[in-house]
Curated annotation (Swiss-Prot):
Transmembrane residue ranges: none
Protein name as annotated: Peroxisomal ATPase PEX6
MF term (GO), any: protein-containing complex binding
Binding site for ATP: 471-478, 745-752
Sequence positions bearing Omega-N-methylarginine: R119
Tissues with expression: In the teeth, expressed in ameloblasts and odontoblasts. Expressed in the retina, at higher levels in the ganglion cell layer and photoreceptor layer at the joint between the outer and inner segments.
Pfam families xref list: AAA (PF00004), DPBB_PEX6 (PF25395), PEX6_vert_N (PF25394)
Major subcellular site: cytoplasm
E.C. designation(s): 3.6.4.-
Keywords associated with the record: ATP-binding, Cell projection, Cytoplasm, Hydrolase, Membrane, Methylation, Nucleotide-binding, Peroxisome, Peroxisome biogenesis, Repeat
Role played: Component of the PEX1-PEX6 AAA ATPase complex, a protein dislocase complex that mediates the ATP-dependent extraction of the PEX5 receptor from peroxisomal membranes, an essential step for PEX5 recycling. Specifically recognizes PEX5 monoubiquitinated at 'Cys-11', and pulls it out of the peroxisome lumen through the PEX2-PEX10-PEX12 retrotranslocation channel. Extraction by the PEX1-PEX6 AAA ATPase complex is accompanied by unfolding of the TPR repeats and release of bound cargo from PEX5.
UniProt source species: Mus musculus (Mouse)
Length: 981
């Protein structure tokens, strides 16, 4: 993409669309003819993001523009500058789009009126923007977010009534607002209080234009900033400049589902954005900066040399000498040579005060490789602390100077240990937050454990500050620890325990001691040991390594007071606490478990992950969060990755038969395309299938009541037991509810199908458990399998646990005859888990069995499986007809087919499985007939397969009931026996 400079043309021609670009003659662009389409993006933006497609034409206003050295100019309106969040003279990347995407479908919203009129030629439109027709807006476009609206575009029109009104984009932006005029003598000298928020860039305070006027300050003026504390002199003021912070937004947000509203909201008048380093030096809490006191800087004056004018605004003097110390960190070596890094940093004058921590950027610094550990650029910033400043300090609240390469001599005085400010790590915004979505409670608990050891009297605390964090892989353990360290200003040293494993115990011991020694050199710090269960095991992984376990325990319980000031805290993560040696586990006085994500937490994570992505109007994130029951943070991130991949596959498949060319794909990526609900659905199915096969993760089946024929009374009883507590929890405030349901009856009557349909209709996750699969040969493993089933169900709540063949899992105790009493213990564990369901409101248990008389009687007592529902065979023709209609509703039947006549040829006693066998046999007969007709050339391959009356009658003649009349009578006797109890 070529580099270009934006020049404001004022006034902008009224006959030209406000978001178009005028090309001066003689530029690098080809002859426009009927016009060009350019893709524009700010020069600092990533090339992977969508760009803004604009029309480029030659206009009368472009004739007088003189081409000078440097990038070619583009004449634009102020409206386009606002869209790109840039100012006049900004540089952009411009790319010629030779084949702009042609929109295949678009949804337009129009106000009541004459509607759309005819237009000659294609029209370049963007989702969320207004059309030249008054009162019309583009709500949705396919396949791209922006493209050409032409004769081949299918239009869907809806009324604008009830939707968001036209925002500020419909107003005329060709003329800028009048600039603020504030005289110096009218400026206020009083102290003002503003609410601080962590944010902004650089070293300056960010305020809105109206707030700057209300403060009586000028752009770039120096002010004293201090915390508003109850105790006097508790916070030493810091010097900073005031800059107007313009609201910014990304193009993907502008073209998102809420793009009809103004993307960038103006800053509140009483709000000030504080850079992280300045907030740290002020002693502010990163989460809640609180109220700040702003006072004009009245002392000193900057008199630039060799200039004909000087600023009337007062400013701090330059320091003659600046003595700094490098702060020890695990991400860079404190013994490296960073003269060039410091020289480039101080080429711009910087404010320095004694005790301040300076953040020096290493972006683009190749020299940092020489001083980096392992010769890798592991950290984007380096930290230094101001030890002493020498200069003529004017009288004021504190001594503050400016330091640069011209007026100041810089001395590096050594190393120091100190807290550091929390800065963005360069990861995506959800994981770079001080309160990661879905993990706020865990981060708060970690901070509550670590913070007392950082207080002045923290060395007097008994016990170590070691935390064991347990959670499944991908649950956000490392993210939570990183956020806690950022809140507390701690260094973080991440060490995967797989890198500490070695061939001998002595080598592992040496690596452990070196790791702890390295962490102590950069205190206060947190040493994060991931997968700590890998340590303390022998090479085969079967037994414990006593030497390694003893060494790790000794390092964790080190009580040396000198080494704890500043402290070194250890956080270890594991997926299974049971795999950790007992001696190591007892060395952690604090154990935390990553909580299961609730539906609200999953929704907040999805909203954070998709905040900068264009979504289709039909995407329902709350419904998607409901379907992701049991997912951890990593699963939701993988869901988004699979969704993007599915969207790319869909876009490629939507092209011509030969596929999209490389140029077409590039133009489509520049225009951007939304993520649709079908992309999320396809990705979710892939993940749920993979999880179900790997770990038995619960999922929601796709079975509805239309798939279940008959059984109306059974449906009613099941819904009263399960649906009522979900829809009206206030009716069950006394805790009186049924959580267990037992379906019994002959085989093949649809007991499993009923349970799946209930899960689908009530939007519940479904966890199917076969009785024999929980039995294990090892002692205690069968009981643990039962506990894990209920734990997975609680994690995926609201959930239904379906126990099929329950009589094989929970027979009557004392009759099993096994030598170890395994079945008796399994039944006892199952009873204990069922009793604990009363504390979990959204977990239901459904059991299915053919022989309820073989079950342990304790299972059928109140509070467990206290609702018995008999699912019998269909005996009357009306119920059999409903079942047969449900099975054949997806078949293509001939018009002459009569299902009632088919049933007249069948035996009287039929179960649902028998009727399914009838349809399967008839379909096989139809397939054989189809193959025979194709071989004889009597039928085309493209014709549909029809099920004829003859096929069904042949299958009915061969049908034999799977349950005899004697067996049905026996099942009815069992029903009467349990109904009388």
């Amino acid at each position: 993409m070529a580099l270009a400079v934006l020049r404001v043309l004022d006034p902008f021609p009224t006959e030209t669309p406000p978001l178009a670009v005028l090309l001066p003659p003689g530029g690098p662009w080809p002859a426009t003819g009927l016009g060009l389409v350019l893709a524009l993006r700010p020069a600092s933006e990533s090339p992977a993001k969508p760009a803004l497609l604009v029309a480029a034409v030659e206009g009368s206003g472009a004739q007088g523009e003189q081409r000078g050295p440097g990038p070619p100019p583009l004449l634009v309106s102020r409206a386009l500058l606002r869209v790109l969040a840039l100012g006049p003279g900004a540089r952009v990347r411009a790319r010629l789009v030779r084949r702009p995407p042609a929109l295949g479908w678009a949804l337009l919203a129009t106000a009541p009126g004459p509607g759309l009129g005819p237009r000659v030629g294609p029209l370049l439109v963007r989702r969320g923007e207004t059309l030249p027709v008054p009162g019309s807006r583009v709500l949705e476009t396919r396949p791209a977010l922006q493209g050409l609206l032409g004769p081949g575009t299918r239009l869907a029109v809806t009324e604008l009534r009830g939707r968001a009104k036209l925002g500020q984009e419909s107003r005329d932006h060709s003329h800028p607002p009048p600039p603020p005029v504030v005289s110096s003598f009218a400026a206020s000298h009083s102290v003002r209080r503003l609410r601080g928020v962590l944010g902004g860039t650089g070293d300056a305070l960010g305020v809105s234009r109206s707030c700057l006027r209300s403060l009586g300050l000028f752009q770039g003026e120096w002010v004293w900033v201090a915390q508003v504390a109850e105790l006097p002199n508790s916070s030493q003021p810091r010097l900073a400049q005031v800059q107007v912070l313009e609201p910014r937004w990304e193009l993907s947000e502008r073209l998102g589902p809420n793009s009809g509203q103004q993307p960038g909201e103006p800053l509140a008048d009483g709000l000030v954005f504080l850079p992280a380093t300045l907030a740290f030096n002020l002693g502010c809490d990163p989460l809640e900066v609180g109220e700040l006191r702003i006072q004009r800087y009245l002392e000193g004056s900057i008199a630039p040399e060799n200039k004909g004018s000087c600023s009337p605004l007062p400013g701090p003097p330059f320091a003659r000498e600046l003595h700094i110390e490098i702060l020890s960190s695990p991400h860079y070596s404190a013994n490296g040579n960073y003269d060039h890094v410091l020289y480039r940093h101080f080429q711009t004058p910087r404010v320095v005060q004694e005790g301040d921590v300076l953040c020096v950027s290493t972006a683009g610094q190749v020299e940092i490789l020489e001083g980096s550990l392992e010769r890798l650029p592991r950290w984007r910033e380096m930290f230094f602390k101001v030890k002493k400043t020498v200069g003529e300090a004017p009288e004021g609240p504190a001594s503050a100077f400016l330091a640069d390469t011209t007026h100041t001599s810089l001395y590096l005085a050594g190393t120091a240990l100190s807290h550091v400010p929390s800065l963005p790590s360069g990861r995506s915004p959800p994981w770079d937050s001080l309160s990661p979505p879905g993990l706020e409670a865990l981060v708060n608990e970690l901070c509550a454990i670590l913070k007392p050891h950082l207080q002045p009297g923290g060395t007097l605390l008994t016990g170590t500050s070691c935390v064991l964090l347990q959670g499944p892989p991908g649950s956000g353990k490392t993210t939570a620890v990183t956020a806690a360290c950022s809140r507390l200003g701690l260094h973080l040293l991440k060490v995967p325990c797989s890198s500490l494993c070695a061939d001998s115990s002595r080598a592992v011991e040496t690596k452990l001691q070196a790791t702890f020694s390295r962490a102590r050199r950069c205190r206060p710090a947190v040493l994060l040991l991931t997968a700590v269960d890998l340590l303390g095991r022998d090479r085969d992984g079967l037994g414990e390594d006593a030497r390694v376990a003893a060494t790790l325990r000794h390092l964790l319980l080190d009580e040396d007071a000198l080494s704890r000031c500043p402290p070194l805290m250890v956080v270890a993560t594991t997926s299974r606490v049971q795999d950790l040696p007992t001696d190591v586990q007892t060395a952690f006085p604090h154990e935390l478990e990553v909580p299961v994500l609730s539906e609200a937490q999953r929704l907040s994570i999805l909203q954070a992950l998709t905040a900068h992505l264009p979504l289709g109007q039909e995407v329902n994130l709350p419904q998607l969060a409901r379907r992701c029951a049991g997912f951890v943070v990593g699963d939701l991130y993988a869901l988004l990755t699979h969704t993007c991949r599915a969207a790319c596959t869909r876009i490629r498949a939507s092209g011509s038969a030969g596929g999209l060319s490389e140029e077409d794909e590039g133009d489509l990526c520049v225009a951007g395309f939304p993520l649709l609900a079908e992309d999320f659905g396809q990705a979710l199915d892939q993940l749920q299938t993979a999880h179900s096969q790997a770990v038995g993760a619960p999922r929601i089946p796709s079975v509805s009541w239309h798939d279940v024929g008959g059984l109306q009374d059974v449906k009613k009883e099941i819904l009263e037991t399960i649906q009522l507590p979900l829809e009206h929890p206030e009716l069950l405030s006394l805790g009186l509810r049924r959580s267990g349901l037992l379906l019994h009856g002959p085989p093949g009557t649809g007991k499993t199908l009923l349970a799946k349909a209930v899960a689908t209709e009530c939007s519940l996750t479904f966890l199917s458990v076969k009785g024999p699969e929980l039995i294990n040969m090892y002692v205690g493993q069968s009981e643990e399998n039962v506990r894990e089933v209920f734990a997975r169900a609680r994690a995926a709540a609201p959930c239904i646990i379906f126990f099929d063949e329950l009589d094989s899992l929970a027979p009557s105790r004392g009759r099993s005859g096994d030598s170890g009493g395994v079945m008796d213990r399994v039944v006892s564990q199952l009873l204990a888990e069922l009793d604990g369901l009363h504390s979990t409101q959204d977990v239901f248990v459904i059991g299915a069995t053919n022989r309820p008389d073989l079950l342990d009687p304790a299972l059928l007592r109140p509070g467990r499986f206290d609702k018995l529902v008999f699912v019998g065979a269909s005996e009357d023709r009306a119920s059999q007809l409903r079942v047969l209609s449900a099975i054949t509703r997806k078949f293509k039947l001939e018009a002459s087919v009569s299902l009632a006549n088919v049933l007249d040829c069948c035996p009287p006693q039929l179960t649902g499985a028998d009727l399914y066998s009838l349809c399967s046999d008839a379909m096989m007969t139809a397939l054989k007939r189809r193959v025979r007709d194709l071989e004889e050339g009597l039928e085309l391959r493209s014709s549909a397969l029809l099920l004829t009356m003859e096929d069904l009658l042949q299958a009915a003649a061969r049908l034999q009931p799977s349950v005899s009349e004697q067996e049905l009578l026996r099942y009815k006797r069992i029903q009467r026996k349990f109904a009388a109890c």
